[in-house]
């Protein structure tokens, strides 16, 4: 039970780090083009859905 909790926590932390890095890169791109902003928001929302369903 303990190892399972630790694994899920590590997975959530890893996904959060990936999403953070992805959002940072998307925000850097969106500063160049405004159309990328809504695209980044949509993908971040999709990542959030995947994280909630995966955990």
From Swiss-Prot:
Residues 1-30 form the signal peptide. Keywords: Signal. This is Protein Tp75.
């Amino acid at each position: 039970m303990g190892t399972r909790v630790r694994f899920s926590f590590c997975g959530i932390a890893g996904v959060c780090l990936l999403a953070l890095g992805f959002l940072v890169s998307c925000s850097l791109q969106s500063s160049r083009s405004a159309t990328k902003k809504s695209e980044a928001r949509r993908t971040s929302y999709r990542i959030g859905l995947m994280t909630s369903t995966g955990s």
